[in-house]
């Protein structure tokens, strides 16, 4: 069983912002596998389904980004999911737009949502899909809570689809295979 977590902030004003990439990827997976994310529990919205023979729980924490660990630990404990089977999808400023990076473990890298998840799980050993949003020329908060330009949005839509495929690959083939397949790929207009 896998817990697939998309990080983001709740509220219409955050829809389609850089910081909500995780929510967007979870929505793509939900659509592909006909999983309704319409249940409220674990301080978030979630749905249950299958990818092949694997049961998956899709979770969108409603705690705001910096407290995402509260939601993740509640769902993981309830379903008794191993940390190695918790996949977290989130935005990453250290990666260029058009790229993603799959990792099996690692530090928070300055991302407060991941930092909170690491604290609550008491471990940094869980797979993640880091989606590049590029470096800001402006205030970081304004940047991550801002929307993509039209040109960026064209690239991001393709990256979101690729990120969903990377998550599915982790479930079906394992982290190493997903890393080999998706790390280093760059999508351009």
From Swiss-Prot:
Can you tell me which residues form the catalytic site?
19 (proton acceptor)
Output the PROSITE patterns linked to this UniProt entry.
Answer: PEPT_TRNA_HYDROL_1, PEPT_TRNA_HYDROL_2
What are the GO cellular component annotations?
cytoplasm
Q: Where is this site: Discriminates between blocked and unblocked aminoacyl-tRNA?
A: 9
The reaction(s) annotated as catalysed by this protein in its Swiss-Prot or TrEMBL entry are: an N-acyl-L-alpha-aminoacyl-tRNA + H2O = an N-acyl-L-amino acid + a tRNA + H(+)
> What residues does tRNA bind to?
14, 64, 66, 112
Keywords of this entry: Cytoplasm, Hydrolase, RNA-binding, tRNA-binding
Assembly, in brief, is: Monomer.
Matching PANTHER family, A to Z? PEPTIDYL-TRNA HYDROLASE
Q: What is this protein called?
A: Peptidyl-tRNA hydrolase
Instruction: Write down the species.
Output: Clostridium botulinum (strain Kyoto / Type A2)
